[in-house]
Amino acid sequence: MAFWTVPYRAEAVDTNRDPSMYWEDINSASTDDAHNDFFGQFVDFDADGTVTATTDNDFNTVPASMPGVPESMLLMGDRTVATLESAVSSCVSSADEFDFLSSSSRIGPTASAASHEIDPKDLTLSADELAHPSQQQFDYLGRGSMSEADLSRLESISLHSPQRPQNTTSSDTPSPKPPNTDARKPKKFVEALSSTIRKATNLRRNRKAAAVPRQVSPPQEHLQPLKIPKQRRGRGRAVTQGNLPVSPPLQQQEQATPHFIHGQCDDPFNDTALLPPGGVNLQYYGQVAPDTPVESPGVKNEPNQSHFQVDMAWQHHHHPHHHHQQQQHPPPPPHPHPHPHHHQQQQQQHQHQHQHHHQQQQHHQQQQQQQHQMHWTGTGGEYITSQEAGWWTPNMMSQGPNDFSHHQRSASVHVMGHGQHTGMPYDYGAIADTSTGGLMIHMPQPRGSQSSVVNDLTVNAQTFLPPPPPIPQAIGQKMPGSERSHRPPKAKSSGARHLSCSPVRKQRGPSSSPTPADQSAVPRSRHSSGASVSSLRSSSGRLPASMPGTPCSVRKRRSRDISGSNSATSLGGSDGASGIGFVNFTPNDGSVLMTGVAPSGSSKTKARREKEAQDRRRRLSEAAIKAVAAAGGDVDKLIEQGFAF
């Protein structure tokens, strides 16, 4: 038995079908299945020429009716499989010609909008009509007459496609019906589809062609967006690349740029723009802007802020200054092609300038240390967690109380951090309490080790101590790298900004290096190390009193004790425990906590278990001696060798 199957595409069907185009007297017909009528069937041919039309939806073959069959070929028969003459098969010879079949609706009692399982048993062909495929009599088999629209449509449809003999291999009787009427419609349909496809492809090609010149024609558009990353990379490389001759103009520009943006920037999430360069390594608070190692990793080699005076909002220096330079230096956009060489020169100059930013950063780190031209008093911006010098300078004394309070707000956040980060001991006089200003409440816990230091600083805020002599430039240059190494990565949350500003935990090890003499001599500078907090707390009895009574200080004290409990134990020993109100024990303290406690839970149980163990050992030794004696060994010699019962 040979059969022939034809796949179809259901989406090609015209779903907007005239509802009148269905068999009128069959009440089960549904117009909603019009889209299923598009020849989405498998047509199976038996060896004797019978055709089984089966609907295939996702390859679920079910018997279905052939919608385009003339009524002369529709006969109600018994419940056998619908047999169709080869003329019907010629109507379904090719997928391109299925369009004319899609107009008629489902026939059969099982047709419904939800299911296209049409029982073709309703449709059978008599043997007489199989023998006479060419007859065109339209008797409706006792049923009601068809509508004129259906009748005219069926008359216009030829059941004998010329392509049927070519595509069907097992049909017995090819039909000689005129092929033109059917062939024209599918051809027109195919031509329409092909034309629309061509148009669509042409439009796509045109769009692509238009896009290509748009990309190629203005190379400057690409060059300008690429400049900024290149320059940023240049800034990163500037430390290794020395283009000193360009640096002086950069200084001039930097001096001019502070006026690029005036005012204060309170953006809490824009740390990278506000952080000072890592190169600013002023080891002494009295000098300009002690370096806050707070700088985020991405801003490592920003141009040095030492160029900026107090009135400059230097936190804007990094990005506004760079953008300002970029605006100055990028080549004029209208002439990318006419002046390629000029464009390259400008790019090179721009890169050199950024490189000189880095070089100047290093030079100005030293200049800041040596020159007091810049006393940052916090006017550069209120958001100074990592930016201002933060230390009270002689200018602070001249400033009014409002300025001083502002400086407290801006600088006290990192007041402790600068000395800590530089790892240098500082001498401070007595300072008024800043905690009353509400500062301590807002300070992050990571800085907790500095609370007493802040208290001491605030007590002596306006008594300015001259800074020690500046550190040599070689040391100043080396320090930024070391400080960066101690900087923790910037936290994801904005609140952790302060944590990144003061890597207290990282600094504890190296910053605890100051000798006990320094700590005792300068107990107020306890900010110099996180570990020294515990040591000072244990060594000097005044420390508990010096701690601020604010809730934040309590929280900090607790966190300091937790983190520095080991250092407190090592530095202060038991004396520190007496001076500490809260102690967080660790597993290492088990020997202290568990002394005098029987692990088994009771002394009686412990004694009983020890006695049982001794009995076992005694029995084993006796058994061993008996075994040796039984073997003929010298028991006395065995005992002399150290064998014990």
UniProtKB/Swiss-Prot annotation:
Keywords: Activator, Conidiation, Sporulation, Transcription, Transcription regulation. Disruption phenotype: Produces fewer branches per conidiophore and thus has significantly lower conidial yields. Residues 158-187, 201-249, 284-376, 461-578, 596-618 are annotated as: Disordered. The lineage of its organism: Eukaryota, Fungi, Dikarya, Ascomycota, Pezizomycotina. Residues 362-373, 528-546 have a biased composition (Low complexity). Residues 240-249, 509-518, 562-572 have a biased composition (Polar residues). GO terms for biological process: conidium formation; sporulation resulting in formation of a cellular spore. The keyword Transport does not apply. Residues 315-326, 351-361 have a biased composition (Basic residues). This is Developmental regulatory protein wetA. Belongs to the wetA family. BrlA, abaA and wetA are pivotal regulators of conidiophore development and conidium maturation. They act individually and together to regulate their own expression and that of numerous other sporulation-specific genes. BrlA, abaA and wetA act together to positively regulate the expression of the Pks1 gene cluster that mediates the biosynthesis of an anthraquinone derivative pigment that contributes to conidial pigmentation that provides protection from UV radiation, heat and cold stress. Induction: Expression remains constant during conidiation. Expression is positively regulated by BrlA and AbaA. It comes from Metarhizium robertsii (strain ARSEF 23 / ATCC MYA-3075) (Metarhizium anisopliae (strain ARSEF 23)).
